[in-house]
């Protein structure tokens, strides 16, 4: 086995744990919105004036919202630990800035969630939903940069010189790391735009504005009548088509390129799976008249598609050659 001189396994493992724990928070938040439980309690930060409100385990709306709050507080504490640990043990300035950004973002998330309740304002809920995606990507960036993989993207000649060579990532079809990065940034922008549109659609109650799939009730691709709910819903579908086509082209070129790290190829293949899963879930939302389970998973996997795309892109920013040493 090999490792880099600066690799800190415990910190790397903890950063992965925070990403894993955030998975539950994202699902809880998505489910809370899916069942319309965002205002299950009229107060904040307490719930009905208590940390353990009466009857919250028996009422679905109260259970969803209070669980979301408890998970949010727990993730906040984990993020604080991660930020402090990173500042103490990691000398890279940009890593410290990422750790600080994660802490600032999670505090902002908590405040936005509170403002959504105190002011009963869906605009805060929309911003809260979008910032959650940014927070997840920051955590993924920290976890990636703490990994041994970050320091040596491609291993050449295990048992020989054992050096990681970024130059070997140059593709014979022009799919260089810079090209992967550029197209990845474009895709991240498209997906984040889609997440914003989805949040607006979701919180404005337009999830069934076009109640049939894939065509409109009139049997057309484009609606005959236009209102804001129909327009935002159609925009969500149209952007999904664009993202799917661009993503497939990007990921397939990565997978077919022999000189790209096999692990990056695996991530690209996983992205393709998520794309088709998202299309299926989007259809199920319509066909089940917005059942909470497919709706929540559609939101949840959308966040991880964004994070996965960013992860592939983020790895292309690392261009140092780092030697490794045996344990």
What residue ranges belong to the model's regions?
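Polytopic transmembrane helical bundles with strong interfacial aromatic enrichment
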Residues: 1-157, 162-164, 168-327
């Amino acid at each position: 086995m090999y490792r880099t001189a600066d690799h800190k396994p415990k910190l790397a493992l903890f950063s992965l744990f925070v990403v894993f724990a955030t998975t539950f928070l994202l699902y809880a938040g998505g489910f809370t919105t899916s069942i319309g439980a965002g205002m299950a309690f009229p107060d904040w930060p307490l719930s009905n004036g208590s940390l353990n409100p009466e009857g919250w385990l028996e009422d679905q709306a109260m259970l969803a919202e209070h669980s979301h709050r408890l998970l949010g507080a727990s993730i906040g504490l984990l993020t604080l630990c991660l930020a402090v640990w990173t500042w103490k043990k990691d000398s890279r300035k940009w890593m410290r800035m990422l750790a600080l950004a994660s802490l600032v973002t999670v505090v902002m998330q908590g405040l936005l969630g509170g403002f959504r309740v105190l002011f009963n304002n869906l605009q805060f809920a929309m911003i809260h939903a979008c910032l959650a995606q940014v927070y997840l990507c920051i955590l993924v960036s920290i976890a990636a940069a703490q990994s041994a993989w970050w320091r040596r993207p491609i291993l050449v000649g295990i048992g020989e010189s054992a050096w990681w060579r970024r130059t070997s990532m140059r593709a014979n079809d022009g799919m260089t790391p810079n090209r992967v990065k550029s197209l990845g940034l474009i895709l991240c922008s498209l997906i984040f735009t889609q997440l914003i549109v989805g949040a607006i659609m979701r919180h404005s109650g337009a999830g069934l504005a076009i109640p049939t799939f894939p065509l409109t009730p009139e049997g057309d691709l484009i609606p005959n009548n236009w209102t804001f709910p129909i327009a935002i819903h159609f925009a969500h579908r149209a952007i999904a088509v664009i993202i799917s086509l661009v993503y497939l082209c990007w990921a397939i070129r990565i997978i077919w390129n022999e000189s790209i790290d096999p692990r990056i190829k695996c991530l690209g293949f996983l992205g393709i799976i998520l794309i088709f899963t998202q299309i299926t879930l989007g259809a199920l939302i319509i066909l089940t008249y917005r059942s909470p389970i497919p709706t929540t998973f559609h939101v949840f996997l959308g966040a991880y598609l964004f994070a996965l795309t960013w992860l592939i892109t983020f790895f292309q920013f690392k261009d140092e050659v780092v030697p490794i040493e045996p344990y």
